[in-house]
């Protein structure tokens, strides 16, 4: 509740989105994670009283590309979690220009473990994409640009075919986050 999540030292998620948001970040974009515990992190704002998690994205260092797809059966049932990840980096021969792009598509079926009609795991549909690029303008200087787009729909509870206000119990979030910097 009081932990601020940052991407490249910038706040991306609200307190509520932070509960679910970390799940939207593809691992293939992460270079490292910095954790600052306690009140000293409050300089990042009121959401950071308990601490700050700063996710640093990868900077392009060599030409590369990768794609992967994972399908997981949830609890041995007919519910599945599908994730597709894509990333690529292009760097000029003199290392003065570089760009890294990444993306993830996630689709997870709702799962009712005990058959009571209420989901234990929500249905999720999400997409994440972004890039980080640089131009070295001098021996000790560089201009960096980055963009991140996160979009997710999540629905749990019962009667998933009905609008949330008509269900007995409903959990639903639908958000899109866009951020960038130069």
Question: What is the predicted function of each stretch?
Answer:
Residues 108-128, 134-136, 140-182:
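Flexible loop and strand-edge segments within Gram-negative outer membrane beta-barrel domains
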Residues 14-16, 29-31, 42-54, 58-114, ...:
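Outer-membrane beta-barrel translocator/receptor signature
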Residues 20, 40-44, 73-77, 118-120, ...:
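Outer-membrane beta-barrel domain signature
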Residues 8-9, 139:
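Residue-level detection of beta-strand-connecting loop/turn positions
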Residues 2:
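Exposed beta-strand and adjacent loop surfaces of beta-rich binding modules
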Residues 10-37:
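Short acidic/polar hinge/loop motifs at secondary-structure boundaries
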Residues 5:
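Short aromatic-centered micro-motifs
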Residues 38, 58, 148-150:
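Residue-level recognition of strand-loop junctions within catalytic nucleotide-signaling folds
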């Amino acid at each position: 509740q009081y932990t601020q999540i940052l991407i490249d030292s910038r706040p991306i998620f609200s307190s509520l989105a932070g509960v679910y948001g970390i799940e939207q970040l593809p691992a293939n974009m992460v270079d490292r994670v910095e954790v600052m515990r306690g009140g000293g992190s409050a300089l990042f704002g009121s959401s950071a009283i308990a601490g700050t998690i700063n996710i640093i994205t990868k900077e392009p260092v060599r030409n590369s590309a990768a794609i992967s797809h994972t399908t997981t059966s949830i609890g041995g049932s007919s519910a599945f979690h599908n994730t597709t990840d894509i990333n690529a980096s292009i760097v000029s021969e003199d290392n003065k220009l570089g760009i890294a792009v990444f993306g993830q598509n996630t689709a997870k079926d709702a799962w009712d473990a005990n058959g009571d009609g209420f989901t234990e795991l929500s249905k999720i549909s999400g997409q994440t994409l972004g890039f980080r690029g640089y131009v070295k303008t001098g021996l000790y200087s560089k201009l960096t640009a980055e963009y991140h787009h996160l979009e997710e729909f999540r629905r749990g509870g019962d009667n998933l075919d009905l609008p949330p206000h008509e269900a007995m119990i409903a959990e639903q979030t639908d958000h899109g986050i866009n951020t960038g910097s130069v």
